[in-house]
Structure formats: C-alpha cells, structure tokens
C-alpha cells in the first residue's frame, strides 16, 4: 500500500512521468435516493439516443446500470444535423455539495513575456476523459425507454464527468491542474496558462519550449487526457481565450455586434456584460458608454421592452471600431508596472502600463452607491481595486502611481480624504504627476472638475451673508441684503431648501456666505461641484441636483455654505437672521402672499390682516408685477362738505383686460364718510337700472339718509324721485362746474378700474368668470382689505365701526 501511495515513475515516450491524478469524489447533502422518471421520446430521437449511447458505451464513458437513481435523458439536433445527448441533472445537482469556482476570472494574456515563443493546445472532450469517483457513478444513471413498453428499458450510468453536473467544471480544472503540476515543477522558468481545457505554454527559447511541451504531452497522456491534434497552435497569430496574440501585441478577435436582436432588458444586459468583459482591452471610458448603460434603467423585468436609442447606437459603433483597432502589449517580466490615473469625464480612467506600453485599462462602474461621490474619492476608489488587479496579475504593487494632482494636493488628500487613505494604504512606491509622453492616451476626454474651484471650506471675508429656508408647502425664501420669496411645486422641505440655495447662487454674482438650516442641502451643495451624481428613479430630484451642479460650475465668484440649527432660541445675529428667513415661508407670510396673489390688496391691508412686518408687506406688493405697473402714488380719498352717498353711472369702454359685453354700464356708489363703495354692472342707465343698482347697495351698505348724484336723466326722473320718497332718502344733485363731489366719484372710478385690471391679469382666482363676479372681487378688496393713507381701518370697518374677522357661523 505504501509503495502505491509513493510516486511511481514510469517511462512514456522517453520521458519520466508520475502516477496520474485520482478521481475526485463528490460530497452529498443527503443519502436520499433521487429518481426522476424518463419522459417518452419520439421514434426519431429514440433511435438517435440509442446510437449515441452505444457510441459512449464503446468509448467507455458509460456502463450498464441497475442504479436506484435516475435522471431523464434527451437529445437535440445541432446545426450540422448531428445529434447531441444531454442529461437533465437538476434534481441530482440539488443534493450535491457545491465545490465553488477555482478560477473566478480569465487569465490575462498580457502577462505572457513578449517575444517568447508559444504553443497552445486544446484538450479533446475534456469532461469525457476525466473519471468519476467509483462510488458516485450510480448517481448519474439514466434510462432509454422502449416504445409501448414492448421490451425492458435499457439503463446506463456515467463513468466520466457528465455535462450539466454542478461540479464538473471545478473537477475538470482540478484534475487537469494536477496533471500539469509536474510540468510546472520541472519547468518553473516557463510561463504556463491553464484555463479549463485550454493550455498555453511559453518559454524564453524555442528549445526550452519544445522540451516543456514534450514533457507536457507525456503528463497529459498519463492522466488519460487527450490533446486535440487539429487544434495545436505553434505560430502567430495565436488565438486564445478570445484574443489574438502576436509576438508583442494582443488584439481582441474581430466580432460584429448584432443590433437587430436587442429588444429586451435581458438582451442589453448580456450585451453590456460581454462588452464589460473585454473593456480592459478595448479601453472604452465609462463616459463613452453612458447612453448604453442608461438603457438598463427602469423596469427590472428581464423581458421588459428596451429600445436602442440613436446615441446608444453610436456607442455600439464605437465598441465595434475599438474591437477592430484596440491592442495591448505583452510585458517584459523584468520591468515593473505603473498605474496612470486620468481625470476623464464622468469618472476617472486607470491605465496599467510598462514603460510606455499599454497593458490593461481600468474603470469604475457607471453607477455609484452614494448620491454624491467626490471626484477625488473616485480617484482613490479606482486606485484601490487597480492596485489589487496589478498584484493579481504579477504579484507586486505598481512601482509608480501617476495622478492628476500636485504634491500639495496629494498631501492634503492624505490628511482629509478617508477614501484616499484606504486606496493608498501600505503603498510604498512613488506617487507622481508626470505622465509619459505618448499619443496613446490623447483621445481621452478630460475634465477640469477634480478639486473644488468655486466651493470654499472656510467662510469668505468681506462677503455678503444670505440665509435660506424652504417649507413643505413649496415656498422658498432667502433674506440678506434683499429678500425674495418663490412659490415652487415641491412638497418636500429639503427640495424647497435646495431651490432656495440654487436661487441664491443664481441671484448673487459676487462672493457670498450661505447659511441654511438643512444639513442635507448643505452637504449636497458642498460636494456637488466635483461630484458624480448617482442616477435616481426620481426625475424631479435628478433635475434639481443637475441644476445645482450646473449653477455652481457656472459661477464666477466663490461661495461658502454652512448649516445652522433652526428654532434653538440661541442669542446672536445668526439665529435672528435665520428666524427672519423662516418667517418668510411661515404660514402668516404665505397667507399674505396668497391673498395678494388673489386680490392684489395693498401693503397696509396686508399688514392689518396678517402678522407680518411693514417691510414684508411692502415687499410682497413690490414683487408683484401688476401692482408695480398699475399702482399710482397713494392719494387721499377726497373730502365732501357733507356726509352722504355719492352716485354715478357711465358706460365703460371695453378694456383689453375687461370684457363686460352687454353689462358695460357700471353704476358706482361711494359713502363719503367711510369711502366704502358699491358697484353693479347694468345693461343701461335708465331709472330702472338705477333703482336695481340702489337695491343692491342697500343690501350691503344699508339705507342712507342722503344721496348726491349728478344731473343725469336717470337721477332726475319722477320715477326715481318716487322711489327715493318711498325709502325716505333725501336727494341732492351736484352744482355744475363744482368738482368737490365729482372728484371723489372720478377717483373711485379710477381706483375700481385699476383694481379690476390687476386682478384680471395677475390674479390667482380662476372662478371669477363673469363681469359681476370680477367686480365683486375688486369691491371686496377695496372695501374689506385695503387701508388708505391717513386711515387705520378698512372702509368696511370705518363704515360699521367693527373689526373685520372671519365669520364664525355657517352660511345657509
């Protein structure tokens, strides 16, 4: 037994070999038998299955079986019209303990020393030349049924690795690896790559390569493996693992991407997976594939429809062009590798080089985990994995890392950036900023936004200070040298605050210090200048972040932004100023803004009705475009020698904003004591129209003792005098050419017309669709809201002697 365990050297083709590797047993999760019935097969497929089984039986790959295990077997016809036998091993795989992958990635052919001669071989039917452990064979039994059960079924079991078995790839790698280990031991100075059934040998001289290959042939045969004689490559160009290998250059094999099959998410996912696999050779920066990556966004259903956009089509064309022209280099095993980091658009690009020879490209993923990733952090994030990649390729850290930073910026990065400290941990090589002089990298689209230029980390001296605030009702405001309030559609306080900061950055073209009570917005604004913004399914948020970044980058002057806690009651000017900004978006201020937008009430009326300051009330009116254009300097309402009601009627000419139609005769009444006014739209100016107007006035103002009118026919008729007599009203008319009463009426007309125009053009009320409704809204504003010069109450309060307040009862 001991002699059997010792290495037993035998002679084969004149070369000393060792005992072949033994079969590798499987580990089972359970001892429970697995039996899946064989389904019926058509006669044609059944005949093909019998032929294939006999062929495998003759080759010794299967043997007759009486196993209590069974898996279904079937055949498929290949394009060549030949049949292929497959076994459905899903049920058996479920009870096998997985071994795990041994080669999680492809070996890089760039590590093959340049100018070394090569031989590449392919093992023939590798799975079928590797034996199963004897105790595992019965688990892979299958049945060939008979038509109509006219005879017993024929049963076989596999003696070699069956295709579709969970651990067949791992066992194949292990078995071939053990067969090649004596070759590696004896020819340690040769470079041997083994990936499944593909084997590449390189040696410094052709004689050394021949010796190595001769020994390898013997070891492969001794292990029971067979070399495919028609696939032996001994001259350039070599084809290995999808690459075309020459003496010094390596190129991707020429392929054409089919675009007509790209219809679903699954199609694009596979395409981009294949492109990503070859990108380290092609050198396509992340920014050049943004539109292709964007197609993967949206519905996660693999069958969800996707469309190839014109921009993405151009990017596929770029990939095809790179496949035709891209190349990397085989290395000099004695020279160290270096890492170059280029500040490309979107995210940095890494390049592994040796002297000036390109070895491999390195990129960051298109999407990030964090909402904002600083460009400096992206550089550090790229350096870390690329260092590990270089160690994986050659076993050593890069000799030098070249970055687009000055020595002082590198020093500051080590002090302030945690990502930088992690990415360059334990690095003992050189950090430089001098790039090699070569045209290889000139096509890269570089960015200048590496470190902040506009954003400052310390407060600016001799700069304006502006406080911002946003509310969940969509109102945003800032206060400082001037105040501004904006209504936005956002129902999030943070998004409203973001709009406030953007507005400040746009409005102040000078150095500024911004103080906000949103820590989230402050951090976002600090980082956004050089950050990669993570895509969000929220389009609204994407637009805000992109607008913030564009606004910051377009500025000509620096800014500083910091956070202040709201509602702390701390003493000092900062807290007070922040409260002032809060007040601008508070409920009282917002209600004042909304009322003015509806009615265009004057500043005194706003101050009287709401808990706002004079400055805030005036600012609301001054920021109204209608009130700025139409408001004239405030005049006193005029004085009449006696207290009475003045009446006037006249036809109003059609105004561009007032379409009165048939109701173009506006009758106006004004109380000389309170200046309370009442007006109605009528179709004429006869006595009947005057009486109708007065009854409307009585319903609002009550019945007056005196009425003063002009000498119009509607006021001098007997019918009108009889009407006044019934209501016990004294009537007088104005003295011709005496303007005391007439001036009040004319000013009232002008005030009413101006108010109507303002509300019609700039009011928020969409319900006032008829002339009388428009007139009533104007009268409500003038009587119940506005306060005029030298007055402390509204006209309605002056008339009744009571303070206006919301009605507490119900209108029935």
From Swiss-Prot:
<dbReference type="InterPro" id="IPR010661">
    <property type="entry name" value="RVT_thumb"/>
</dbReference>
<dbReference type="Pfam" id="PF02022">
    <property type="entry name" value="Integrase_Zn"/>
</dbReference>
<dbReference type="GO" id="GO:0006261">
    <property type="term" value="P:DNA-templated DNA replication"/>
</dbReference>
<feature type="binding site">
    <location>
        <position position="469"/>
    </location>
    <ligand>
        <name>Mg(2+) 2</name>
    </ligand>
</feature>
<protein>
    <recommendedName>
        <fullName>Endogenous retrovirus group K member 18 Pol protein</fullName>
        <ecNumber>2.7.7.49</ecNumber>
        <ecNumber>3.1.26.4</ecNumber>
    </recommendedName>
</protein>
<keyword id="KW-0238">DNA-binding</keyword>
<keyword id="KW-0862">Zinc</keyword>
<feature type="short sequence motif" description="LPQG">
    <location>
        <begin position="161"/>
        <end position="164"/>
    </location>
</feature>
<keyword id="KW-0255">Endonuclease</keyword>
<feature type="binding site">
    <location>
        <position position="596"/>
    </location>
    <ligand>
        <name>Zn(2+)</name>
    </ligand>
</feature>
<feature type="binding site">
    <location>
        <position position="469"/>
    </location>
    <ligand>
        <name>Mg(2+) 1</name>
    </ligand>
</feature>
<keyword id="KW-0511">Multifunctional enzyme</keyword>
<keyword id="KW-0378">Hydrolase</keyword>
<dbReference type="InterPro" id="IPR003308">
    <property type="entry name" value="Integrase_Zn-bd_dom_N"/>
</dbReference>
<dbReference type="InterPro" id="IPR036397">
    <property type="entry name" value="RNaseH_sf"/>
</dbReference>
<feature type="binding site">
    <location>
        <position position="517"/>
    </location>
    <ligand>
        <name>Mg(2+) 1</name>
    </ligand>
</feature>
<dbReference type="GO" id="GO:0035613">
    <property type="term" value="F:RNA stem-loop binding"/>
</dbReference>
<dbReference type="GO" id="GO:0000731">
    <property type="term" value="P:DNA synthesis involved in DNA repair"/>
</dbReference>
<feature type="binding site">
    <location>
        <position position="624"/>
    </location>
    <ligand>
        <name>Zn(2+)</name>
    </ligand>
</feature>
<dbReference type="InterPro" id="IPR043128">
    <property type="entry name" value="Rev_trsase/Diguanyl_cyclase"/>
</dbReference>
<dbReference type="InterPro" id="IPR002156">
    <property type="entry name" value="RNaseH_domain"/>
</dbReference>
<keyword id="KW-0808">Transferase</keyword>
<dbReference type="InterPro" id="IPR000477">
    <property type="entry name" value="RT_dom"/>
</dbReference>
<dbReference type="InterPro" id="IPR043502">
    <property type="entry name" value="DNA/RNA_pol_sf"/>
</dbReference>
<comment type="similarity">
    <text>Belongs to the beta type-B retroviral polymerase family. HERV class-II K(HML-2) pol subfamily.</text>
</comment>
<dbReference type="Pfam" id="PF00078">
    <property type="entry name" value="RVT_1"/>
</dbReference>
<feature type="binding site">
    <location>
        <position position="600"/>
    </location>
    <ligand>
        <name>Zn(2+)</name>
    </ligand>
</feature>
<feature type="binding site">
    <location>
        <position position="497"/>
    </location>
    <ligand>
        <name>Mg(2+) 1</name>
    </ligand>
</feature>
<feature type="short sequence motif" description="YXDD">
    <location>
        <begin position="195"/>
        <end position="198"/>
    </location>
</feature>
<dbReference type="Pfam" id="PF00075">
    <property type="entry name" value="RNase_H"/>
</dbReference>
<dbReference type="InterPro" id="IPR001584">
    <property type="entry name" value="Integrase_cat-core"/>
</dbReference>
<keyword id="KW-0863">Zinc-finger</keyword>
<dbReference type="GO" id="GO:0003677">
    <property type="term" value="F:DNA binding"/>
</dbReference>
<keyword id="KW-0695">RNA-directed DNA polymerase</keyword>
<feature type="zinc finger region" description="Integrase-type">
    <location>
        <begin position="587"/>
        <end position="628"/>
    </location>
</feature>
<keyword id="KW-0548">Nucleotidyltransferase</keyword>
<dbReference type="GO" id="GO:0008270">
    <property type="term" value="F:zinc ion binding"/>
</dbReference>
<feature type="domain" description="Reverse transcriptase">
    <location>
        <begin position="57"/>
        <end position="245"/>
    </location>
</feature>
<feature type="binding site">
    <location>
        <position position="582"/>
    </location>
    <ligand>
        <name>Mg(2+) 2</name>
    </ligand>
</feature>
<feature type="binding site">
    <location>
        <position position="627"/>
    </location>
    <ligand>
        <name>Zn(2+)</name>
    </ligand>
</feature>
<dbReference type="GO" id="GO:0004523">
    <property type="term" value="F:RNA-DNA hybrid ribonuclease activity"/>
</dbReference>
<feature type="domain" description="Integrase catalytic">
    <location>
        <begin position="637"/>
        <end position="803"/>
    </location>
</feature>
